[in-house]
């Protein structure tokens, strides 16, 4: 006779009480704090000489133990079909440099399984980034779901591994890595299509682009002139002081456009700051 059962979600397989218990485990204030402090979820991790190799699990050790206990208790009484799996569809890392482009060094980033003593890259998904390549976005996609088990004294789960190479003479932070992911937990698992690790080089942000318009540059020059005139231009002649004040007023007050050919129009043209080489 063919199997006629239906696939049930984790919430359907467990009672409402145990489902609430799982929510408390995952989203309690303590769990959220542990995800930030132990896993650096959504936080910037600094790569320094004294931290040349960084291994960051995607689940805090305490949270891992509580989730594993939740699934095991449901499995032992026949409410759940397994002792639990961790699923991570994708891990996305934003990498930026914190030294000049001529610094000789690189980063090696990959996803590993803490159940592997060697911490080898999962399915060869590994990305190397030279310092002059940065900034960049890196992505990893595990091809399987990780069992929530303990191997030796290690809580098995996925982890982001970052290795710093080179950067001779740079003992401080040479790169910043911000990782984001969304871990899922279920009593069922699957295998997934193998996808190579993604590496997208990003153009550095041009923060001066908004000041390329003449109007923005003119405002910048006016503000600079206004800042230095009172401290540097100390004139003794009263008549010249009066003229200097009128120049300042021309720079600070935007008057309505005067008619072409009028004396006021020629006067404003005389005191207009000049733009040199697009600045």
From Swiss-Prot:
The keyword Isomerase does not apply. GO terms for biological process: transport of virus in host, cell to cell. Residues 246-279 are annotated as: Disordered. InterPro entries: MPV. Its main location: host cell. It holds the Pfam family 3A. Transports viral genome to neighboring plant cells directly through plasmosdesmata, without any budding. The movement protein allows efficient cell to cell propagation, by bypassing the host cell wall barrier. Acts by forming a tubular structure at the host plasmodesmata, enlarging it enough to allow free passage of virion capsids. Keywords: Host cell junction, Transport, Viral movement protein. One of its GO terms (cellular component) is host cell plasmodesma. It comes from Cucumber mosaic virus (strain FNY) (CMV). Residues 254-268 have a biased composition (Low complexity). It is found in: Host cell junction, Host plasmodesma. Belongs to the cucumovirus movement protein family. Disulfide bonds: none annotated. This is Movement protein.
